[in-house]
Amino acid sequence: MTSHHAPTRRTVARGGLAGAAALLLGATPALTAPAAASGPAGSGPDVASGGRGIRLPAPTGPYAVGATVRHLVDPSRNDPWAPEIGVRELMVTVLRPTATGRGFPRMPQLTPGAAEVFTALAPLVRPHLPAAGADWAATLTHARTGAPPLPGRRPVLLYSPGGGDSRAMGSSLAIDLASHGWTVVTVDHPGDASEVEFPDERPGRDPIRTTVLRPDMDAGTFRTMIDTRVADLRFALDALGLDRVGLYGHSAGGTAVAQALHEDPRVAAAVNLEGYLDWADGTLLPVAREGTDRPLLLAGTDGFRDDRLDRSWWALLAHGGPVARRQLADSDHWVFTDYAALVPQLQAAGLMTAAGRAEMVGTLDPRVSVPAVRKLVRSFFARHLPAPR
């Protein structure tokens, strides 16, 4: 790993600002994810429903982790991908340290409905993934649905996934951070996420929305995606009553969190996991053009070689300030996600090729890459937004 150094408040539907903020303290019941069968820590199914179940690595912190799912609605914005809906909706998962997860079911990575949709979408959004043979509904996370949080306030981190990915594909890192004492909120961005499941129907949309992104995404679509994500993150801060947070995001999510750091003083620090800092035409984002006086980590891989990424990152680094760059060796773009652990299992099962694995996550053993990514992100926030122990 190498190193280079160099609001406006909106109305919140569905429960109101006070209720949403209380969610972070565990004082208000929230919409919970469908239950999954419980099992011992570190266990997971090998084969289920005729397909191969794949396991996520256990968290490393001293706390068990509880999970709740929340539906947030911003009536002040329309959805840019589906204007007929009339509002902008988000789905988020709130992960918090808990004294014990005993007696509470493990949260599935994907609900049965989302897994069914993702099975069809997987080889389209990520061409190296198998079209059959993987039972995406069988994978359990290490968070416990409905487990009560520890009392008191804790620093909050928000996660924005990459374009074409759902928040579910960032579960492992988020749960690990929560096990070390942070409250972590993973955010779906409906319209560009692979699939987002809602608790109800609404005129203009089905219970599960799928991605509008296509391989030939143009410059205008990329700009809409980033602008919408930044607005989503800022709305989530409004909705949850937060005033000093950390953000981290992968790919397009990394782009969004870096720009949100620039725009919103409530963001104390951010981690950009291999996201561009310019628009598709090469015009620098304001954060890269003007620099930042708040901590920002730029983390990349040696497998994702891209002149555009390097140019936009170096433009920001040239300003100096509390910005650092790190690089993971023998890795590629999706090593920062759950795919770091899942893809090698799919390859071992004969469902992916070695070349497909290398193009997605690199050749590094997940027993090395997963701890490396966790330590990288955790140590950054431990310095700039430490969690109580």
What is the predicted function of each stretch?
Residues 45-47, 52, 57, 330-333, ...:
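Alpha/beta-hydrolase-fold serine-hydrolase catalytic core, especially in secreted/extracellular enzymes
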Residues 26-52:
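C-terminal region of N-terminal signal peptides and the immediate post-cleavage residues
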Residues 238-285:
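Primarily recognizes the serine-hydrolase "nucleophile elbow" in alpha/beta-hydrolase
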Residues 269-333:
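The feature captures the conserved acid-bearing segment of alpha/beta-hydrolase catalytic domains
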Residues 147-154, 159, 163-196, 305-306:
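Short substrate-entry loop that stabilizes the transition state in hydrolases
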Residues 2-20:
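N-terminal secretory signal peptides and thylakoid transit peptides that target proteins
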Residues 44-157, 358-366, 382:
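Domain-level recognition of soluble alpha/beta enzyme cores
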Residues 202-240:
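Alpha/beta-hydrolase active-site loop
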